[in-house]
């Protein structure tokens, strides 16, 4: 008998929440907009299509399109709160739908805490090895007082150093946070074609033990 994992047989429905819910293109909100609550009405529609899983993302606090992450453990204020998303996942599970989120692990936004610390403290920053190609001998085209490797030359997306054990642990802890607080069922890897294979192998080992 051939055993299949649930995702091999699932019918996925893809949601890009910032677009579907009409969020502002730039995150300048001072208050939270509870747009995720509007997604709850989509659950019966997805079930009617025989959907058994939702791939949703990016979800977490970012400056613009969702892939320039500010905070891996906070739902984007343009979408709602952590509690809003946890409730959405709960409703999905009650309707037999699993939830997979976007894992944006190749890079962050420039407003991410580690990047901001390097901007402020330069060589004295404990996070100076969290990004690839950090060079204090030149500045970025965006005015940062150091250079760094950026995803496909987009300097608003500085590349994380996934060979750094501290970076890996931070990301693994963030995933544990998602499992504990949202009860997610899986992760889609953004930019998987450029992720370090060793990181992905360890990621698989760590997450298999989480749920």
What is each stretch, according to the model?
Residues 1-211:
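Active-site and adjacent substrate-binding regions of carbohydrate-active enzymes
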């Amino acid at each position: 008998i051939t055993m299949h994992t649930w995702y091999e047989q699932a019918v996925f429905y893809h949601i890009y929440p910032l677009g579907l819910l009409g969020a502002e293109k730039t995150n300048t909100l001072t208050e939270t907009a509870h747009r995720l609550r509007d997604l709850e009405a989509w659950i019966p529609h997805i079930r009617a299509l025989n959907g058994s899983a939702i791939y949703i993302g990016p979800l977490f606090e970012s400056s613009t399109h969702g892939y320039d992450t500010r905070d891996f453990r906070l739902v984007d204020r343009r979408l709602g709160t952590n509690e809003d998303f946890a409730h959405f996942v709960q409703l999905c599970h009650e309707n037999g739908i699993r939830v997979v989120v976007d894992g944006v692990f190749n890079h962050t936004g420039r407003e991410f805490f580690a990047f901001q610390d390097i901007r402020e403290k330069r060589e004295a920053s404990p996070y100076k090895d969290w990004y690839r190609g950090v060079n204090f001998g030149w500045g970025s085209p965006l005015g940062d007082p150091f250079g760094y490797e950026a995803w496909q030359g987009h300097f608003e997306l500085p590349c994380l150093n996934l060979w750094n054990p501290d970076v890996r642990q931070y990301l693994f802890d963030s995933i544990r946070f998602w499992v504990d607080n949202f009860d997610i069922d899986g992760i889609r890897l953004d930019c998987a074609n450029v992720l370090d294979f060793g990181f992905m192998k360890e990621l698989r080992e760590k997450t298999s033990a989480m749920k």
